[in-house]
Amino acid sequence: LEFCEKITRRMAEHFNKYDCIIGWQLDNEVNCETNEYYSKSDHEAFRAFLKERFGTLDNLNEKMGTIFWSQTYTDWDQIHLARRSTVGTGIANPHMQLEQVRFISHSAVHYLALQASIVRETAGDRFITTNGIFGNLDYQKLMESGVDFIMYDSYPNFAYAMDRPDGGEGDLKDRNSSFNLARTRAISPLFGIMEQQAGPGGWNFRIHQASPKPGQLRLWTMQSVAHGADFVSFFRWRTCSFGTEIYWHGLNDYSNRPNRRLEELSLVKAD
């Protein structure tokens, strides 16, 4: 957090000088690929979190029901982030597992709140937001952390990723996108789309997706607007020619020449 604070402050002080900056996106897709952590410092922070919540070990033991299956703690150092039990693959204590989820959410919200407070010092009337709907994160508390609203990343084509066991045509697998748009609106009545799918996608090792059919980009954009999005931006503008996201196509192809997707976007503008 020390380095996070320094970097955020330097960036805010530098870029808030420019009138062309209309707002700030904090981080990117917090808790996306990884939302569980097990380093030494994470275990220590989890103990500190529990001490603040429960005060004493006796109180924690009572609230967590640790007397069941001989889990009673006699020292704070005996507590770790939830571990697998010796009985099958489940977590031994569901109450401690819930506290772990609360701890992870608390850590992420605190991390974003720190950045928001620093940016706000010099942001003026610029908006502050973050993007994505992911696990182990209490978005109601996130909305109270200093952001003005949240953004959603809309990738309907994920439903048909070629490496999914149930991939392929049919079965309306993309309806999850409608659900997530409705969920985003419930969390943040004012919201936007930070990343609207702009073409075929995929990393170099997974989630490969076919090219959208003619009219699908326009359809997906209107889907976001129909669900209440006040802002739509596309990911990405120009297809990257290197790196893990080399197959994640933008509105522009590798050639940077006019193409069907750009023509379709012009129809969206006309709409």
Feature annotation, model-predicted:
Residues 1-149, 153-174, 237:
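Polysaccharide-binding and catalytic clefts of secreted carbohydrate-active enzymes
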Residues 79, 125, 155-158, 164-271:
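Carbohydrate-binding surfaces of carbohydrate-active enzymes
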